[in-house]
Amino acid sequence: MENKETTTTTTTTNNGSDKKKRSLKIDLHTHILPKNWPNLKEKYGYGGWVSLDHHCSCKAKMMIDGKFFREIDSNCWDPDVRIQELNRDDVDIQVLSTVPVMFGYWAKPQDALDLAQYLNDHIAQVVSENPKRFIGLGSLPMQCTESSIQELRRCILELGLPGIQIGSNVNGKNLDDPSLFPIFEECEKLGAAVFIHPWEMVGKDRMPQYWLPWLVGMPAETCLAICSMIFGGVFQRLPNLKVCFAHGGGSFPFTIGRIEHGFNARPDLCAVVNPINPREYIGKFWVDSLVHDEEALKFLVNLMGEKKVTLGTDYPFPLGELVPGQLIESIKEFSETTKENLLGGNALEFLGLDPNKYL
């Protein structure tokens, strides 16, 4: 059944009259934190952890070992504020995941597991209180294979989350590292969706200024993650693994020609694990729509296919799309069916969820 038929809903105006039917709008890429959490330095006995300084009623400073990292607004922790903004922007559902700085891959595995459980329980609670507006993705202590599989099973089988968010590397280990494969294998077995967000960006020591880790490092880091999974045979060995990469797949879609040419020119260097041309994997994974440019998004949809790009805004952060779906909706060349796929249908397919649950 086509997404156009299964994701259409009727919205209602303030006076109760029905507006024109439209498809579900689902933002796959949003971040949330608890309003408070324990003092992790005291709890675990060492530093490096994030804390929140609620210095006024609607803002908080994210601090790492007493040093300022980022200021956030109440929409980063308050579901009621988020719902107000969802209604304002005609967004039906947000998919919630933690802020990547909370991954804790550098920490002792038992502590990273404890924090992941705390964050996952929080997301599951937010979803349970607003099940028509929120869907949750869990976090894993990826530095420990056994603990990750344990928490993955809890997320999917006990908390009812449809998937997880992970970083683009784990303490410098690329995503083809053998220690990570059993986690991906379990994800495929459980049907769990895997959203991959860049963090600990490659080359960040050379990017001390101009916000370059976010502007240049993140797209490069995501491309590195995709190539690692392709060349390292993860997609080859796990053909049913569901993966979506943030930020439109980073620089990968725009350098696939170079990647393919290198594979063909030097198979002795590129095809040492997986003999399949990397272009063959286009359309085998998803990317979000967060590219900030009309021509880039048209190229991305044409390359990946209209069923493999899904709305993602990076809400509530300023580098995201500030009006969710505005770019998709503004492109005249996209048919209504294409827009419906991009705005919601593709997210539901990636997550393995029945649209009727949200109508």
Swiss-Prot record:
**Does Zinc appear among the keywords?**
yes
Q: In which pathway does it act?
A: Secondary metabolite metabolism; quinolate metabolism
Entry's Gene Ontology cellular component terms: cytoplasm; cytosol
The record's comment on protein family reads: Belongs to the metallo-dependent hydrolases superfamily. ACMSD family.
Keywords of this entry: Decarboxylase, Lyase, Metal-binding, Zinc
Q: How does it assemble?
A: Monomer.
Mind listing the GO biological process terms from this record?
negative regulation of quinolinate biosynthetic process; secondary metabolic process
The keyword Zinc is annotated on this UniProt entry: yes
**Molecular function GO terms recorded:** aminocarboxymuconate-semialdehyde decarboxylase activity; hydrolase activity; metal ion binding
Show the catalytic activity. Answer: 2-amino-3-carboxymuconate 6-semialdehyde + H(+) = 2-aminomuconate 6-semialdehyde + CO2
What this chain does, per the entry, is described as: Converts alpha-amino-beta-carboxymuconate-epsilon-semialdehyde (ACMS) to alpha-aminomuconate semialdehyde (AMS).
Name listed for the protein in its UniProt record: 2-amino-3-carboxymuconate-6-semialdehyde decarboxylase
Q: Which Gene3D superfamilies match?
A: Metal-dependent hydrolases
Taxonomy of origin reads: Eukaryota, Amoebozoa, Evosea, Eumycetozoa, Dictyostelia
EC number(s) per UniProt?
4.1.1.45
Residue ranges, compositional bias (Low complexity): 1-13
- Name the InterPro entries on file: ACMSD (IPR032465), Amidohydro-rel (IPR006680), Metal_Hydrolase (IPR032466)
Q: Which residues bind Zn(2+)?
A: H29, H31, H197, D314
Please give the organism.
Dictyostelium discoideum
| Positions annotated to bind substrate | R70
Region feature (Disordered): 1-21
Pfam families xrefs: Amidohydro_2
